[in-house]
Amino acid sequence: MTNESFKSGFVSIIGRPNVGKSTFLNRVIGQKIAIMSDKPQTTRNKVQGVLTTGTSQTIFIDTPGIHKPKHKLGDFMMKVAQNTLKEVDLILFMINAEEGYGKGDEFIIEKLQTMSTPVFLIVNKIDKIHPDQLLLLIDEYRKRYPFKEIVPISALEGNNIETLLAQIEAYLPEGPQFYPSDQVTDHPERFIISELIREKVLHLTREEIPHSIAVAIESIKGQDNGSVHVAATIVVERDSQKGIVIGKKGSLLKEVGKRARADIEALLGSRVYLELWVKVQKDWRNKMSQLRDFGFKEDEY
């Protein structure tokens, strides 16, 4: 294989909240790099997954769910999503087969009309509907936008993923290998660790603490015995939320720690001692300086 025919490019995954973008990314890359939760808007920064094969390198950008902003954090997420689309080689517009066409999709298709980037329609969760329904759904979308390819998949089950990856590679331009072969994301470990902790809090608190939570990593230190000490603070907006995150006699926080530790150990490949605190910072979502502390960098957007 001569290097001249090597292909590389950037692929953006967009769609309404909860269509399975993170599940797809994690299935393709084979590691838990995008936070997965069934609450809308759980992906906040541009998590990049890097897939390298003998013939190509695909850099996936997982944009926040496109939605009409409600506050500064929402504004921020919307801006990231739109700017990302201008810089990529291919856009994967993912929909949930069960939900069908909706207002949120109209909003996204409107944005796509102004772009020259090729767009694939990815119909996810096909294991949940009848094939006849699937064909009707595909027709519905085909009428509204000239998609280059339409690919039905199940990210969770892995159905049709290989076919999709081959089609993506066909659309990539020839180019260099941007990242080393063994690199799966360009986010530093500190960021991934904070996202893993955040994911556990979202899972365990359900609706009570939707997006009023950020995780700040205070320190990551290697110990003499080969283990790693991680200290992190979970930041909430109200005192009542602090009580929920800590739980009865600290039970919920303990469970967050237990689950997060298992994932962090898998990520780092060593034993981890995880220390967690909970802190209240009122209305952090509307304060830009605090957004910056939590890794939302304005200059990237």
Swiss-Prot record:
On the tree of life, the source organism's domain of life is: Bacteria
Give me the ranges of the annotated region G3.
62-65
- Annotated region (G2) at 41-45
Keywords, in A-Z order: Cell membrane, Cytoplasm, GTP-binding, Membrane, Nucleotide-binding, Ribosome biogenesis, RNA-binding, rRNA-binding
Do you know which Pfam families this protein is assigned to? KH_2, MMR_HSR1
Q: How does it sit in the membrane?
A: Peripheral membrane protein
**Main localisation, per the record?**
cytoplasm
Era-type G domain residues: 7-174
Record-level GO BP terms:
negative regulation of DNA-templated DNA replication initiation; positive regulation of cell division; ribosomal small subunit assembly
Q: Which SUPFAM superfamilies match?
A: P-loop containing nucleoside triphosphate hydrolases (SSF52540), Prokaryotic type KH domain (KH-domain type II) (SSF54814)
Residues holding GTP:
15-22, 62-66, 124-127
**Locate the KH type-2 domain: which residues?**
205-282
Per the record's keyword annotation, is rRNA-binding included, yes or no?
Answer: yes
InterPro entries per UniProt: G_ERA_dom (IPR030388), GTP-bd (IPR006073), GTPase_Era-like (IPR005662), KH_dom-like_a/b (IPR015946), KH_dom_type_2 (IPR004044), KH_sf_prok-type (IPR009019), P-loop_NTPase (IPR027417), Small_GTP-bd (IPR005225)
The induction annotation reads: Constitutively expressed, two-fold induced at the end of the exponential phase; this is under control of Spo0A, suggesting it may have a role in sporulation.
* Localization (cell): Cytoplasm; Cell membrane
Q: Where is this region: G4?
A: 124-127
One further remark on this entry is: Estimated to be present at 3000 copies per cell.
For this protein, the record's NCBIfam families field holds: era, PRK00089.1, small_GTP
Share what the entry says about its subunit structure, partners included: Monomer.
Name recorded for this polypeptide: GTPase Era
